[in-house]
Amino acid sequence: MRILLVTHPPLTAELGAPQITLRLAAALRERGHDAPVWSPAPVPAGFGSFRRRQTAAIERFAAENGPFDVIDTPVTSASRRLARQGHLVVRSVQPELPYLFHNHAGQLRHHPGPRAAYHAVAALPTAAGLLAGWRRARLILCLGTLELAWMRRRFPFWRHKLGLWTGCPAPEERDLLTAVRRQRATVLPGPGVRFLWIGRWAEHKGTRRLVRFLHERLAAFPADTITIAGCGPSAAEDLPAEWLRTHRIRLVPSFGRAELPALLAGHDAGLFTSEVEGWGLSLNEMLESGLPVYATEQGAVPDLRPDFPTALRQFPPGPTIELMSPAEPGPAYEERFNWASIARSWEIQVQESRLSK
């Protein structure tokens, strides 16, 4: 098949959505498909909203470089014109409606007033656009079982076109993560626990929950420290200056993929505090590197728990931190979570949806 895979951010492995789209495309090419990846970034200036100009750029690219048997795109770009240019697959990289509801509910809760109410009402056309994109899709691939269950409950009339896909590290990164796991000490190396939190500093990532936890934890355990990585420049505004000055908290606003193994190796336990999450590739990365992870029940957590029954733990951590069992993950993990299997599953679901026209 000739498949166009679309991602909105710039095509770089440093960003989550392009990273997993590039990996999926590479795995599909290994299966013999012609699978280019394209991004409209940077979106051209012009008239109309940013989203409309973004979608128009994708429509132009598909028209000028087609025909395509399948067009795999985020739901916000699933337009009528794109649906006419190929078998339209909407592949989720984040739970769009829950994100939208969570963000505006948070604004109304924490900053009530006319401005927050106005923005909540103004988001209704965005929600309508998401519904329209799902309606046009021939196949909706939900990211993880949590999102699939959510979509089935709210949109039972689309059950026939709901599918599932997952994510995992690239093969070359997996080898590095395995090496980190095998070199881990069997006891904590210092008097305190070195926690690691990875993600954008955004409310849906559970930053308020994280800060509340840190106030309690750092007061009760003076030797504990935490690194907050990939957070951008804004995290410092929400954290006490004393914590930063005394290095109880270390901020790493950004890091390259090559720096990830050393970052993981230098910590004892991971934290995952999301309130709404798509998948959370950092979960795979922390667990595969041998870190026990204290996590909220979001993103990939229920999908990964069968393979990490003791390493994947409920947030917040208790007073004692036990290291990860060397028996985890079991052999079934890499059979389920590898890009060859993910691409094969994508292929089967797309072929079935094409036959059901």
Regions found by a protein language model. Give the residues of each.
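Nucleotide-activated donor-binding/catalytic signature segment of Leloir-type glycosyltransferases, i.e.
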Residues: E237-F255
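Membrane-proximal helix-turn-helix segments that form the acceptor-binding/catalytic region
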Residues: P112-I140, A149-R153
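Aromatic "clamp/platform" in nucleotide-sugar-dependent glycosyltransferases that forms part
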Residues: E275
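Short hydrophobic beta-strand element within catalytic cores of glycosyltransferases
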Residues: P292-A295
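A conserved mid-protein helix/loop that constitutes part of the nucleotide-sugar donor-binding site
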Residues: Q19, R23, V193, R200-E216
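Acceptor-binding helix/loop patch of EC 2.4 sugar-transfer enzymes
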Residues: V90-P125
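Glycosyltransferase donor-sugar binding loop
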Residues: I198, T225-D238, P253
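A charged, aromatic-enriched C-terminal amphipathic alpha-helix characteristic of glycosyltransferases
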Residues: S49-R53, A179-R181, F315-K357
